[in-house]
Swiss-Prot record:
TM region positions: none
EC number: 2.7.7.23, 2.3.1.157
UniProt-annotated catalytic positions: 350
SUPFAM superfamilies according to UniProt: Nucleotide-diphospho-sugar transferases, Trimeric LpxA-like enzymes
Protein's recorded name: Bifunctional protein GlmU
Residues annotated as binding Mg(2+): 97, 215
Length: 450
């Protein structure tokens, strides 16, 4: 089965300079959610129109693109891509602004289409308030009557047309050009193709959210809120403790182990995996990261990092791309890491920057330590081997290596390698000038200024 995604609309109600279908839901353009689902069934094509150059940038290379130069209705959009369809194909019609249509529902639709050998199979739904939707009328044959054309009796029908169809390729090719624009909008509607056949079947979905389209920013926010609630409830049913599901933001592809506790105002995004018995949050953001078991992350930001078991992070830490923390590592308040690996049982608990650093096991990084990794043109590495002790307020000027069991004294600026089992002191000798303040009258003058 092939899929054609219609995404040429103007999206005026979004009141945006960007096309509607590239607005993001869960940090991904909404059209990409549709494309990913459609790829489960075979080849995919999209019909673009309004500002297509911007939409084209987010379309995968293996998806064919067709242009609808004028937006003259859904049937006209399909006409624009008719060469994508062969007579032996079944064509699934989807929409770029209906992002959460599920694979399971489309699989049922495909199964019914093949089983019934219908010319057209329609996905329908039941709405308590169907106002605005075309109604499915069953009076010996299946028809769609638009809301504006419906009698009071027809308006009582709650089964609606979602606009999602599977159509036989040969039937579509033979009849698409027969559709006329005899309506007030002077547009060509794909629903009119049903006039040319009685061989129609239907499948109904009870999940209204999966067939909900996005027309404005309020609908975008409301739909995302509903989907987030479902995501959180699914995780809770799988054994995750979420204290306040209304204040936790988790993307659909995130995986979280049992007995992990999520505090409010936590954002977990992208292809993130979190193990069991973790404590995450509050006020924490984790993106595209892999986290082991029994990890605590408190009021911190983690991006594209790997954290092994029994690690503690935060509060107010930032793990940037390329960070790897081995088992039992402790990263404390106001510590930042980037492209660095930190070995087992090592600690950096206060006011530290570690960039392009490789740190061994059982290393202690003193408060105020900085790896000076950038010379204005090039990044340089720092190596700290097992059991080293880095004193407080150290500047490690890369490239530099601290050997096993070595110690650097507090306040040092380390510019050369430190051998194993050595103590490095790189600071000026302290000089105390006795009674200097009294001789200069400094203290008296200072007091007079108060």
């Amino acid at each position: 089965m092939k899929t054609l995604i219609l995404a040429a609309g103007l999206g005026k109600r979004m009141n945006s300079k960007y096309p509607k279908v590239i607005h993001k839901i869960f940090n991904k353009p909404m059209i990409n959610w549709v494309i990913e689902t459609a790829k489960n069934f075979g080849k995919v094509a999209v019909v673009l129109g309004h500002k297509y150059e911007l939409v084209k940038k987010v379309i995968p290379e293996d998806v064919e693109i067709y242009l609808q130069n004028q937006q003259l209705g859904t049937a006209h959009a399909v006409m624009s891509a008719i060469e994508f369809v062969s007579p032996n194909d079944n064509l699934l019609i989807l929409y770029g602004d209906v992002p959460f249509i599920s694979h399971e529902t489309l699989k049922r639709l495909e199964k019914e289409h093949v089983k019934s050998n219908s010319d057209v199979t329609i996905l329908t739904s039941i709405l308590e308030n169907p106002t605005g939707y075309g109604r499915i009328v069953r009076d010996g044959k299946i028809r769609i009557i638009e809301d504006k054309d419906a009698t009071e009796e027809v308006k009582k029908i709650k089964e609606i047309n979602t606009g999602i169809y599977i159509i036989k390729g040969n039937f579509l090719i033979e009849n698409i050009n027969k559709i006329e624009n005899n309506n007030t909008q002077k547009e060509y509607y794909l629903t009119d193709i049903l006039k040319f056949t009685d061989n129609i079947s239907t499948v109904t979905t009870n999940d209204v959210d999966e067939i909900t389209g996005v027309n404005n920013r309020i609908q975008l926010a409301n739909l995302e809120k509903k989907i987030r609630r479902k995501i959180n409830e699914k995780l809770m049913n799988q054994g995750v403790r979420i204290i306040d599901p209304n204040a936790v933001y988790i993307d659909p592809q995130v995986k979280i182990g049992r007995d992990t506790l999520i505090y409010p105002f936590t954002f977990i995004e992208g292809e993130t995996e979190i193990g069991e018995d973790c404590v995450i949050g509050p006020l924490t953001r984790i993106k595209e990261s892999k986290i082991g078991n029994k990890v605590t992350i408190n009021r911190s930001e983690v991006e594209k990092s790997v954290i092994e078991d029994n690690v503690s992070v935060g509060p107010f830490a930032r793990l940037r791309e390329g960070t790897t923390l081995d088992e039992n590592v402790k990263i404390g308040n106001f510590v930042e890491t980037k492209k660095s690996s930190i070995g087992k049982n090592s600690k950096a608990q206060h006011l530290t920057y570690l960039g392009d650093a490789t740190i061994g096991n059982n290393v202690n990084i003193g408060a105020g330590t900085i790896t000076c990794n950038y010379d204005g043109q090039t990044k340089h590495p720092t190596y700290i081997e097992d059991n080293a002790f880095i004193g407080s307020n150290n500047s490690l000027v890369a490239p530099v290596k601290i050997g096993k069991n070595a110690i650097t004294a507090a306040g040092s600026t380390i510019t050369n390698n430190v051998p194993e089992n050595s103590l490095a002191i790189a600071r000026q000798k302290q000089i105390n000038k006795e009674n200097w303040v009294l001789r200069k009258g400094g203290q008296k003058n200072a007091n007079n200024k108060k």
